[in-house]
């Protein structure tokens, strides 16, 4: 189910999660359409206010930008900003020279056409830490030197489509299945090497068979079109419990289309759940 309004939006399922409470749980934040993984829900109004406050604190901090009086051009984050942490996994088409880890610091502007990179007036600060979890064998690379890689992405800010734009732009590692920002200048089935595309389509069909949807035109297909699905997953979320203050850590298993794609591309998933 999706956390945006529209096709099978998460709001349509909240009533089923009410159980013995007087009202359904409430959403604290959102995920982009077709992004899978962890989503925080609150059982009480008080919990929702506290949890939402974590995100609002981070947003206020982001709006402040960097401090030019600081010689390192960095500011100390308020303690409350550590109350929530989100790590995403993304399957990308990377260059062979992509560094093992780093930080993308690139302001974003939202327009009627989408989100674009634009420093200066009107731009909002946006920063993302990334780390390469696994790279495919060089034998799978394309003639242009592109190679599949699995990244851990940790947004420092929460801008709309931030991870997708940062990957496609400054990182030059478009997320597989991102036809809005990754492959916007080609047809919806283009932008990926032919052998990758055939492999990922086979994976998508295998996923449908495993989920009993073979040959179906489900709502997810209607949203994403004829190409492969978006390979972006909210892998882990950590936050302070709104009542006890204890640390809560939740890890969401990869959806079938991502785990099967990683297996087919030879991307190792060993070790912990990744962190940027």
What are these regions (language model features)?
Residues 88, 147-151, 235:
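Short beta-strand micro-motifs in enzyme catalytic cores
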Residues 1-145, 231, 246-247, 251-272:
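RNA pseudouridine synthases
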Residues 138-145, 166-276:
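Pseudouridine synthases involved in rRNA/tRNA modification
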Residues 51, 159-168:
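Short beta-strand segments enriched for Tyr within beta-sheet-rich domains
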Residues 131, 151-153:
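Short histidine-centered loop motifs in beta-beta connectors
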Residues 29, 154-156, 240:
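Surface-exposed loop and edge beta-strand positions of immunoglobulin-like domains
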Residues 18, 154-157, 167, 254:
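Non-cytosolic beta-sheet module surface loops
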